[in-house]
């Protein structure tokens, strides 16, 4: 696993964070050292796949990066007769995802698409994963995507939405941000790395509160919604499409 040193030296002109070649190269290390509980979320996605993936359906991983969720789904699904569609708009991520998945034999068909997730039609879906992806879309585009997902899910289908959260109470928000930075330092990131990455992300990663996410999911059509995991200001929610 290549170690993330992207922000380890001072960068004179610090642009917005992008999922470019350098990020794709170190992404597994970056995400493990940056997102508390990431491994737990991936493990649970596999557990949810075991319960929700159905025969003959489609499973979508929107913002699939290097394919960690897809591997968990493939390993745990109760049937091999379904299809996985992984989507990412980063060409370097897509190339590495395809290469990574090809190292593990499976009879389950997987199609990795390089495209904007907003362009993807969701059909016959038993499961949709949005793992730390929605936060990179403009807020005005989020409800349309979630509504499309809701309509594309089969009855009893599940959406897994993992995000970094913000909090209305400033004291709580600052505490959880500080704990997250402590977590990153404990994982070997320097103050410079933490600071520069935060600056690079501030215009492209737009976080919402847990209640805002719940309200938006309700507006999209979901009625069964719950936060199932949280560590500091990161977490994951499930939303299930009820049977008629």
Curated annotation (Swiss-Prot):
Reactions the enzyme catalyzes: prephenate + S-adenosyl-L-methionine = carboxy-S-adenosyl-L-methionine + 3-phenylpyruvate + H2O
Domain of life of the organism encoding this protein: Bacteria
MF GO annotations: carboxyl- or carbamoyltransferase activity; S-adenosyl-L-methionine binding
Biological source species: Haemophilus ducreyi (strain 35000HP / ATCC 700724)
Enzyme class: transferase
EC nos: 2.1.3.-
NCBIfam families given in the database record: carboxy-S-adenosyl-L-methionine synthase CmoA, PRK15451.1
Quaternary data: Homodimer.
Family of the protein in this entry: Belongs to the class I-like SAM-binding methyltransferase superfamily. Cx-SAM synthase family.
UniProt-recorded name of the protein: Carboxy-S-adenosyl-L-methionine synthase
Biological function: Catalyzes the conversion of S-adenosyl-L-methionine (SAM) to carboxy-S-adenosyl-L-methionine (Cx-SAM).
InterPro entries: CmoA (IPR005271), Methyltransf_25 (IPR041698), SAM-dependent_MTases_sf (IPR029063)
GO terms under biological process: tRNA wobble uridine modification
Keywords assigned: S-adenosyl-L-methionine, Transferase
PANTHER family on file: CARBOXY-S-ADENOSYL-L-METHIONINE SYNTHASE, TRANS-ACONITATE 2-METHYLTRANSFERASE-RELATED
